[in-house]
Regions:
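Alpha-helical transmembrane segments and their membrane-interface junctions
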Residues: 128-145, 204-214
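Hydrophobic alpha-helical segments of integral membrane proteins
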Residues: 66, 113-117, 121, 141, ...
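Juxtamembrane transmembrane-helix termini in multi-pass membrane transport proteins
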Residues: 3-74, 137-152
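Selective transmembrane alpha-helices of multi-pass membrane proteins
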Residues: 69-101, 156-175, 180-214
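Hydrophobic/aromatic residues within the transmembrane alpha-helices of Major Facilitator Superfamily
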Residues: 12, 16, 20, 53-54, ...
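Select subsegments of transmembrane alpha-helices in polytopic membrane proteins
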Residues: 47-51, 119-133, 194-198
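Membrane helix-loop-helix hairpins that form the core translocation module of multi-pass transporters
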Residues: 38-114, 175
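Small-residue-enriched transmembrane helix starts and helix-helix packing motifs
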Residues: 1-20, 42-46, 107-126, 152-163
C-alpha cells in the first residue's frame, strides 16, 4: 500500500511539472479563460485532463512491449508532424483574421460549456507526445519498484496523471483570469503564440523522427 502513495505523489508531481511551461493545452486553456471566463476555462481543463488520463493508460500499455516494436514511436511521431503542421498554419491564419477585427468582443460567460468540454478533449487528443512521456515515466517508476503493472497500480498512475494535469491547467486558468487588465492583449496575441508553439513542436518532432530513423 505504501508504494501506491509514493506512486500517486510521484506521478502527480511529474504530470504537473510536465505542463508548467507554455504548451498547446495550457495556452489554449488560458485563452479560453481570457475569452469566455474562468468557468469555461475550468471546463476545458477538465475535458483535457480526461484525455490525458487515457493517454497515461495508453502509455502504460505501450511501455510493456514498446522496446520490441520501435515502429510505434515512428508512427506516433509521423502523425504528430501532420497535426502540428496543420495547426501551426491554422492558428497563424486565425491570428491574421483576428488582427483586422476592430470590434471589441463581449465576454460570453454563459457560452456552450459542453462544446468547451469537448474542445478540451480534442486539443489534448491532438497532442500525442504525452503518450511517449508517460511511457518513459512508467518505465522509470517500474525500475524504481513503484509500479507493478497490476490493477491498482495502473489505476493510481492514471488518476494521478489526470489530477496533476488538471491542477496545473487550473493554475493557468486562474492566473490569466486574475490579470483582467491584460486579458485583451493576451486574447489578441494568443493565436500567434499557439502558432509559434505548433511550429516549435513541429521542429522538435522532426528532429526526434530524424534521430530515430538514422
Amino acid at each position: 500500500m505504501s508504494h501506491l502513495i509514493i506512486l500517486f505523489f510521484a506521478t502527480f508531481s511529474a504530470s504537473l511539472m510536465a505542463i508548467v511551461f507554455p504548451g498547446l493545452v495550457n495556452i489554449t486553456a488560458a485563452k479560453t479563460s481570457a475569452k469566455k471566463g474562468k468557468t469555461n476555462g475550468i471546463v476545458f481543463a477538465f475535458g483535457a485532463s480526461i484525455i490525458v488520463s487515457l493517454q497515461a493508460y495508453l502509455g502504460v500499455i505501450i511501455s510493456k512491449y514498446l522496446y520490441r516494436n520501435p515502429f510505434v514511436i515512428d508512427l506516433l511521431l509521423k502523425i504528430a508532424l501532420v497535426v502540428f503542421a496543420f495547426f501551426a498554419i491554422y492558428f497563424f491564419i486565425l491570428a491574421k483574421k483576428n488582427k483586422h477585427k476592430n470590434k471589441v468582443r463581449e465576454m460570453t460567460i454563459e457560452s456552450n460549456r459542453i462544446r468547451t468540454f469537448f474542445k478540451g478533449m480534442l486539443i489534448a487528443a491532438l497532442n500525442v507526445l504525452p503518450i511517449a512521456y508517460f511511457c518513459g515515466m512508467n518505465a522509470a517508476w517500474n525500475i524504481s519498484g513503484w509500479i507493478k503493472f497490476q490493477l491498482w497500480d495502473i489505476l493510481v498512475f492514471v488518476v494521478a496523471s489526470g489530477l496533476g494535469t488538471f491542477a496545473m491547467l487550473y493554475m493557468y486558468v486562474f492566473y490569466f483570469d486574475k490579470l483582467e487588465s491584460r486579458t485583451d492583449n493576451f486574447s489578441r496575441y494568443s493565436d500567434y503564440i499557439l502558432s509559434g508553439l505548433m511550429g516549435l513542436l513541429l521542429i522538435i518532432t522532426l528532429i526526434r523522427l530524424f534521430y530515430i530513423t538514422y
